[in-house]
A protein has these predicted regions:
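Generic structural signal for secondary-structure transition and capping sites
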Residues: 37, 101-104
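Short, flexible, mixed-charge glycine/proline-rich loop motifs
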Residues: 26-36, 85-88
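Cys/His/Pro-rich metal-binding microdomains
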Residues: 1, 40, 93, 97
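Histidine-centered divalent metal-coordination motifs
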Residues: 75, 99-100
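Short beta-strand-alpha-helix junction that forms the catalytic/metal-binding core
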Residues: 82-99
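A boundary/linker detector
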Residues: 1-31, 43-69, 81, 105, ...
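Histidine-centered catalytic micro-motifs used for acid/base chemistry in nuclease
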Residues: 39-41, 72-80
Length: 111
């Protein structure tokens, strides 16, 4: 179970909605994932950064590798309660759960 550090912007915010993951965020996340369905870290690892989704699907089939579908709309810069960052469509990237919980989490702990 994750704990919230004293003084954190999340202290006392027990629901996901109170932490900024409300209807506005859900709409932004859904639109982003529809337009950008692939994990950006997986694309980086496969050498396919910037490729259109259709080309990624075809190339993965040709290479015989799993399509790098992402399910998480992740804030590039942690919003820490800042609504401008939280709802900025340019501050969202698609990640798969392993990259979100692994590499991204490790990078954020360093901040």
């Amino acid at each position: 179970m994750q704990t919230v550090e004293p003084g954190s912007w999340r202290a006392g915010k027990t629901s996901s909605s109170a932490r900024g993951y409300d209807y506005q965020w859900q709409k932004l996340r859904a639109a982003h994932l529809k337009a950008h369905p692939h994990c950006v870290f997986c694309l980086r690892d496969l050498g396919m950064v910037g490729w259109p989704p259709e080309a990624v699907v075809i190339e993965c089939a040709l290479r015989g590798v799993r399509e790098p579908v992402g399910t998480i709309g992740d804030h590039i810069v942690p919003h820490r309660g800042d609504d401008q960052l939280r709802l900025d469509p340019d501050n969202v990237q698609t990640l798969c759960k392993p990259h979100h919980d692994g590499e991204k989490a490790m990078n954020e702990r360093r901040l």
